[in-house]
Amino acid sequence: MTRQRTQHVHFLGIGGSGLSPLAQIHLAGGGKVSGSDAEDSPRVATLRARGVPVRVGPAPAAEKIAAELAGVDVVVASSALAEDHPEIVAARSLGLAVRRRSEWLPELTAGYRLVAVAGSHGKSTTSAMLTLVLRAAGLDPTAVIGAEVSQLGGNALAGSGDLFVLESDEYGGAFAGLEPTIAVITNVEWEHPDIFPDEASVRTAFTAFARRVRPGGRLVVCGDDPGVAAVLAELHRQGTPAAAPVLDYGFGTDRRWRAVDVATVAGDDTARAVVLHGGQEIGTLTLAVPGRHSLLNALAVLAVATELGVAPAQTLATLATYTGAARRFEFVGFWRAGTPDPAVPAAAGAAAAPPVRRDPATAAAAATTAPIGPPDSPPPTGIALPRAAPPAVDAPVAATPAPAAGPDHAAALPAPAGALASRSPTGPATAVADPVGEWSLEIIDDYAHHPTEIRLTLAAARARTHGRALWAVLQPHTYSRFAALLDGFATAFADADRVYVTDIYAARETDDLGRHPTDLVERLVGPAVVGYVPWPELVDRLAADVRDTLSGPVPAQAGGILLLTLGAGTITTVGPRLLAALDEPAAG
């Protein structure tokens, strides 16, 4: 049922991940769409290509805003815009209805069987997997997802069926007005400290969301998650409606949907498990995306799809084809320092390679479609850790002094210039054949910006390093999150060999908390080498360190490097820029 839409809706912040799919759905239903955004972006380009007029840049004078709003029925404003934003003020002065995203979603989803996928982490992946499964089953859903999914052609899908899959965010109460037929809660953890003062307030929001399931609906939850357990306990205390029975999933022995015999293979991106439903084996789940958390997301999809009439065997088959979403453990490219010296024996199975190999399509697309530049606010003038010889190139990030090696610290000694410290007191990992190739750098980009997300992402990466060093580059996202979750960030990088922390991406905030990236550098537990690098220097520093580590007849890290860029801001531009920098001759 493609709903017919007749209103002219003007979206403020139309290029954002929250509003761009809503604009596409409204447009697909026959409605008229226009909008504005502070920055140009691929999403803006997509909308313009479909005939949507979009003004990019700062808000103009009131007279011009009024002209842009002529004929508009409703203005939908991003939650990132303050009430005193000139375009919101102008719209109200013209007597137009101004709605936030949270207020528009019930209107957009009315008349559908709504599957609302909520949770502190994993929403985008779960929503994308579920949409792919439902489409393959011929149910032709409409969907709004918080990430670009190449298999779906973007972050929105306008289907003809009566199902609507909606990634449902707790931020700003975005899911508060929904009435889902099926509600999914992947996990519940303290996040968005700018609006949730503590974990209890987050749980209160999810409890209210869970109680909004329609009569005859279902509540699908991860039974292994302690935050979910707290929400269920509160629902029980309040009296859970019989109309919304709870279906749980996880690794626990008493889960209705359970994964057992979990297997991950070093150097392999796949995750596998045997799936039990009600204690009965229904098949093997194989995913082309890594990590135990991916298996949990897939279990949620199995539970929902089965309730909607899709056979588990068909769901398993479709899940095996899922290739991932943008910025979710996304391959950026790889670079090879050069063909190894024939006098130096390579690890068994390693093949000779041309001097440079990379993924030009991925790198070029990211370089041209993502904004390149510093974070929203000027980088703070913090303490840059000292650099050591040789003078021709920057030395690796200086090591932070660490206590004696023990269960919480990888090594007591700082890394020497041009070398990588051992991950353990017993010495470096044994070099083995690298699936990408020795003397190589592989770059993965991930949206992880919460300690739990970082921990899970690095665990998945560590399982596939295959003899390579694991480097993590973090751009903290928002001052409030960085300050509130600093202790969590400090212990989230235990799987990394080296950590670079750059300037905080401000997003919608101003710096009034007095925190700096060096606060994290001083607290990091686990990695042997850590350091703060100002944003303007980051790519040059990484390029120098990569060359220094991989170059020479006997590289300091012969197995290669797996480098992860982590964060929700402009850090996604670093991978393509680093590949470009490595293509240039080294200074000398």
From Swiss-Prot:
Swiss-Prot/TrEMBL GO biological process terms: cell division; cell wall organization; peptidoglycan biosynthetic process; regulation of cell shape
Binding residues for ATP: 119-125
Top EC group: ligase
Pro residues bias spans: 372-381
UniProt subcellular location: Cytoplasm
GO CC terms in record: cytoplasm
Sequence ranges of Low complexity compositional bias: 344-371, 382-411
Pfam families the record matches: Mur_ligase (PF01225), Mur_ligase_C (PF02875), Mur_ligase_M (PF08245)
Region Disordered, annotated ranges: 344-411
UniProt entry keywords in alphabetical sequence: ATP-binding, Cell cycle, Cell division, Cell shape, Cell wall biogenesis/degradation, Cytoplasm, Ligase, Nucleotide-binding, Peptidoglycan synthesis
Record's keyword annotation contains Transmembrane: no
Assigned protein family: Belongs to the MurCDEF family.
Its job: Cell wall formation.
Xref: HAMAP family: MurC
Name of the featured protein: UDP-N-acetylmuramate--L-alanine ligase
Species per Swiss-Prot/TrEMBL record: Frankia alni (strain DSM 45986 / CECT 9034 / ACN14a)
